[in-house]
A protein has these predicted regions:
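Internal, well-ordered alpha/beta segment that forms a basic, Gly-enriched binding/recognition surface
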Residues: 1
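Compositionally biased Ser/Thr/Gly- and acidic/asparagine-rich
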Residues: 4-269
Length: 269
């Protein structure tokens, strides 16, 4: 199925409360487009063969802010998902997050959704440093802290969410363009399968990583000490907390809302 920011379909037309559907099922006759946001689910393991042309150049992707109003909704749910756009990495290599060019009206943060269960991958053991989170949760990766949070990568075929800044999340505003770079280390080539991201050469960032780990969920919080940032939302340095399906979360509360990645001039106190 394919994601549409500009839709809020009614799931059951006979019930006014079943809205917010933003995914459309696709059939065998539908054509997939590079870098669009798709979701594939199967009850059992299955192989998919996707023929097409490889992309070897920069790619501009368009963000819309046209989610229609929902009858009987209130508050932020009136235009549910407004300005939140889902894409997929159609390169055969990982995208370097710090090479992405964001316009000023878009948050310089990549949000990656985790569909897998971390404990299934680690056997229940605690693993630090890789920024893993529980299934059903988004991981916020700000552009300027990406090397420390998630190895600075959007893996090939990985879905990711981009959104307008809070001030620019206005209905029916102009589209915005984000540029995904291919040349000059815009993507990270993989010569062989990797079990973990390779080392990234970058200036050291002063940070504190806090892990919440239990039998039912796992979550992460990153605090960065960076001169010139504040206790409010600093675009490119802070990542908002998206609350998913797990029952326990960890985040820092700021004047601009909860953050999963928070940068300030000091993290003392």
């Amino acid at each position: 199925r394919q994601y549409y920011e500009n839709q809020n379909w009614t799931v059951d037309p006979s019930k006014s409360s079943t809205f917010y559907a933003k995914w459309k099922d696709l059939g065998n006759s539908d054509v997939l487009a590079a870098f669009k946001g798709y979701e594939i689910t199967q009850e059992t393991a299955k192989k998919y063969y996707i023929p097409g042309k490889l992309v070897y150049c920069d790619k501009d992707i368009k963000l819309t802010r046209k989610a229609p109003a929902v009858t009987n909704a209130s508050g932020a749910n009136v235009n549910y998902g407004l300005g939140q756009n889902i894409f997929g990495n159609s390169f055969t290599s990982a995208i370097s997050i710090d090479k992405i060019v964001f316009p000023t009206n878009v948050e310089s943060t990549v949000y990656i959704y985790n569909t897998g269960r971390f404990h299934d991958w680690t056997g229940g053991s605690t693993v630090t440093g890789e920024g893993q989170i529980a299934a059903g949760n988004y991981l916020s990766i700000p552009k300027n802290t990406a090397p420390a949070v998630w190895g600075n990568q959007i893996p090939s075929m990985q879905g990711f969410l981009l959104k307008f800044t809070a001030a620019e999340t206005t209905f029916n505003g102009a589209d915005a363009t984000v540029s995904l770079k291919y040349a000059n280390n815009g993507v990270t080539p993989n010569s062989k399968p990797q079990l973990a991201p390779g080392a990234v050469k970058t200036n050291a960032l002063s940070s504190l990583q806090i892990t919440l780990d239990s039998k039912t969920t796992r979550d992460e919080l990153w605090l960065f000490s960076q001169e010139g940032t504040s206790n409010k939302f600093d675009n490119g340095w802070d990542g908002r907390k998206f609350f998913g399906t797990p029952t326990a979360f960890i985040y820092t509360d700021t004047p601009d809302g909860p953050m999963q990645v928070s940068s300030n001039s000091t993290i003392d106190g």
